[in-house]
């Protein structure tokens, strides 16, 4: 994205934050404007450029967090996976109504995403249905939730699986957003990995 577009988007993003703009209506308008600039026609995750919203983050009285069009704080695994859902599955996730937050929960918490995925028709799978390389050929998408990673948990997007000579998967190849950057991880296929897998709904399940 051009430097000019980033500067314009930054202007509106800053004005969408309560720290700099006290008027709620103006904040809402500016929020829609920077999202339009950043997300329209984007082929990859649109908030990866660290020149956008490059100020210190705060969710206290001096609120400076910036969210995507799904309402998730940018450069978190939740925002990243929500973007991949839109890119590969056709729709951004819808939040349950009313959205009841648990004590201490923030918009970028990944560990509570089970209820969001189920609300959008995704199905929690058993060990027998864990993702494998066959799902790549069948174009089945999976999202994994790791609840005990850091304070907020972590979402991962299944990309592929490595397998042994018998054809059994031994490594999950996933992508996620961690430490404010996109990362590709290799995770052992094991219950010890602590991943809770969800599979996108089939057409007949929608």
Each language-model region and where it sits:
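Aromatic- and glycine-rich peptidoglycan recognition patches
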Residues: 45-47, 57-60, 151-206
């Amino acid at each position: 994205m051009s430097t000019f577009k980033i500067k314009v988007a930054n202007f509106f993003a800053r004005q969408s934050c309560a720290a700099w703009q006290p008027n709620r209506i103006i904040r809402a308008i500016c929020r829609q404007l920077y999202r339009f600039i950043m997300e329209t026609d984007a082929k990859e995750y649109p908030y990866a450029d660290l020149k956008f919203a490059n100020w210190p983050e705060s969710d206290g009285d001096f609120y400076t967090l910036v969210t995507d069009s799904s309402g998730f704080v940018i450069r978190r695994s939740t925002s990243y996976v929500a973007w991949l859902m839109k890119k590969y599955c056709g729709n951004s996730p819808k939040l349950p109504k009313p959205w009841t937050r648990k004590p201490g929960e923030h918009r970028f918490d990944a560990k509570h995403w089970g209820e969001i995925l189920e609300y959008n028709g995704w199905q929690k799978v058993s060990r027998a249905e864990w993702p494998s390389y066959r799902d790549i050929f069948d174009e089945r998408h999976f999202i994994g939730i790791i609840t005990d990673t850091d304070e907020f948990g972590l979402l991962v997007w299944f990309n592929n699986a490595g397998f042994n000579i018998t054809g059994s998967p031994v490594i999950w190849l996933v992508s996620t957003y961690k430490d404010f950057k996109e990362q590709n991880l290799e995770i052992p296929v094991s219950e010890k990995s602590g991943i809770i897998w969800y599979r996108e709904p089939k057409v007949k399940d929608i």
